Amino acid sequence: MGQHDRYSRPQRVAGIGAAGQQRLRQATVLVVGCGALGTHALDALARAGVGRILVVDRDVVEWSNLQRQVLFREADAAAGLPKAIAAAQRLAEVNGDVEVLPFVAQCSAEFLSMLPATPDVVIDGVDNFATRYLVNDWCRARRLPWIYAGAIGAEAVAMAFPIDGPCLRCVWPEPPPAGDVGSCETHGILAPAIAMVAAFQVAEAMKAIVGAPATRGALTVDVWRGRYAIVDLLGAAAADCPCCSRDEHPALRQAGAGGATSLCGRDAVQVEPAQPRAFDLGAHAERLAGIVGELALTPHLLRFAADGARFSVFRDGRALIFGVGDLLRARALYDRWVGA
């Protein structure tokens, strides 16, 4: 048994075979979000032999991630390494034949428009509905299949959106109000629930790549109560859906710069600059020397502590501010210590 036997088992599965494995090798998959869902999916995609993986995430590895985010190590958390970078490093050890392109960035319409390659399928690993609707609209505009998943507590749901069926807006026309949706901070999260729906996502992505039909309906799981089902949420495209009926894509027109967003499961806020810019981390570190605490400059970010909060500032001008829950205070701290 040698390297040539790596994919011998999946090739024996009906529907894949040698031809399907070759399609996987030639495919490009975009994974949006590198948290619990994203890391499970990334690990499986790399082991499956997907040729190119694009991964975008805005966050850094923290100790609380290690319970459920499978690609990360204690050293990553200690260093505050960007999740996309840490994931790419680990995937290179899993399968050196897979090209992994990490992006430490907010997933925005502008970011998606600048991708170096068009993916064959997109996997949702994010923790907020605003980004999910952006992914839906972008995929719909470019006729790309994508696979949604979300998990909270012991429950999770996943659903494939092929190009020949209805989209997310057909099922849920608008994102739910923020107060109506629990978070992993308020409800917790069990890793087995994540693993189940991430496996579904990867299977659906593989099916899309090899040309097999998508599962119709949503996988719903409750790992604590032992309840598992496929629920038929997908009918025909909604007559009033802007994407499917009018070829409009609202999320692609929404400006996202300059905002502040609470991060799921933590007392932390992401703040974006009012205008996209290249941020000189080294020069800013020199300006802060002697007036802030815990100052540390890495190849990927600048970390420091000030005004009772901890900052991680990235090269695109974004900042994660820890120890702050209020969005207005986070914006004020950003303006004070990073720049308006």
Locate each region found by the language model:
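Adenine nucleotide-associated cytosolic modules
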Residues: 1-340
